[in-house]
Amino acid sequence: MLLRLYPRPCRTIGINAVAHLHSRVSRRSYAVVASSPQEKNRNTVFDEETDVLIVGSGGAGLAAALRCSALSLRSLVVEKSDKIGGTTALSGGGLWIPNNLYGKARGDNDSIENALTYMNHCIGNAGPAASPERRMAYLENGPRMLEFLKEQGFQGRASGQFPNYYPQLPGGDVPRTVEGVVFNARKIGSWSKLVRQGPLSSMPPVYTDEVGKLYRSATSLSDMISAAKIVGARGFGRKLMGQVPVTLGKGLICQLLYLNLKWKFNIWRESPLMDLIVEDGKVVGALINRGGEKPVRVRARRGVLLVAGGFARNEEMRKQYHESPTTSKWTSAHEGDMGDVIQIGSGVDAQLALMDDAWWGPSVIDPVTGQPFFLLIERALPHSIIVDSSGKRFMNEAECYNSAGQLMYRRHRDVPAIPAWIILDSNHRKRYPFTTMPPRFTPKSALKSGFIVQSNTLEDLANQIGVNAQNLNDTVQRFGDMARRGVDEDFGRGDNVYDQFFGDPKVKPNGSLGPIEKAPFYAVKVWPGDLGTKGGLLTDENAQVIGKSGKPIPGLYAAGNTTASVMGRSYPGPGATLGPAMTFSFIAVNHIAKNNI
């Protein structure tokens, strides 16, 4: 019954119309649109008004809208695509929040001091984006943000024992990731059809710390039972009861939508930001192309919050800022992640930082769809290694994906390593899935397309993929010897709990190591993909955008991948993208509420 009270999603014309209109309308033809915060314009005539204008509908945008409602601030969310959720909806949906209420409830011994020690060891000196003030603001407000969500009805959980990505560092021994519990998407009615879909959307309602169990379900009775419970009771069982169970990033977005819909939730879809409106050095609103039909001047009485992602899909910006080779074809970010909001922010003299960085991760490309597949688990499982063009290993394959991506670029400066090759034997293919291929089955189409190369000998495999056969053979032999002893003397693979988390405990003496010894052997190209870019607008501890003057631009806030990350060039743990995004959007709204700027 409650669902009938919710407004139905508005219908708008197609996204192509937005691009068409945007190409026809010169932003500078509108006198109200300032090119710098110093430009004065006191005669703007606005078409719409709100307290807070939120640009972007991912986790950060929806969390900000909810906070606005709770603080009696009227908000308007504008989303340039026809779908809600951004890259958040495509993600695992985890939030890395130290000292959080869910961890405390299960007895975790964490503190701000402990987490700061860990962050400092991970991040080091990464410039003003990761300043001491911003680190502390994040650590103090992350738990408050989660407590606020719980007060609003959010149902979350600690993500099992999902470890930090560098558990061996001081302060790294306490798991800190939180995620939403299984959510019934039927609660939001027709709005669920507007949530962005991605590769993870078709998965059963699994939690982030359970994904490894699905991968190992063919090798372990306990994991098989766990997988059966996930797919059966939690999945089919709930569907039989008329539910639509969702988890991960899609579940997070659906639950945040549900909480927003309890309030007066205002969102314009297919309504991209065209420019910011500045009066007397203060951002007072924006020009929005509403529904692709006409430019609308929206006054933001209290502030504008930019939370519309990064520039992972923008080829020109990637070539301008990122190390070569780079391409948007390797990213897992959604197709609208074009950096337009960063460019518009830069147009009002905002500083940029960390523009050369991203949330890296080894990926393979599906030859049929052209879409990347992020190698989170495959490279941590036994009976696999990654080699460069010379046939040699160059990293701990099981380590944090961000570090692994960085190492691919570092290696490539000396030895061609883009693409690298992941080498598997039949033990790996028999026991574990690889991307979308189930255990024991390698489709002929995958072989025919060249996605995966197969051979009965390592020498022939090396010749097929163009690497030095002797080096590959020597590398495999040495790796096998170390695997049998259980110690990777070259790169330390399997030496910490994160490496082991996605390994196979059935393999002894080290669940992340296993000889490559059983033919046929396989090879797949590996590229330095990413989950999105890490650089953007420079912000302070209040999420205010910093101008080139070194001072905050009044009225302008930003969070998430639109900004330079508080994590610097590091990735401390699962959810270290979404956690800060939602925390700093929470901080932004709090600052807006306290300051009548």
What are these regions (language model features)?
Residues 1-17:
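N-terminal chloroplast transit peptides
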Residues 22-113, 176-179, 183, 189-597:
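Residues forming the flavin
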Residues 102-106, 110-193, 197, 201:
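Dinucleotide-binding Rossmann-like beta1-alpha1 core, especially the glycine-rich loop
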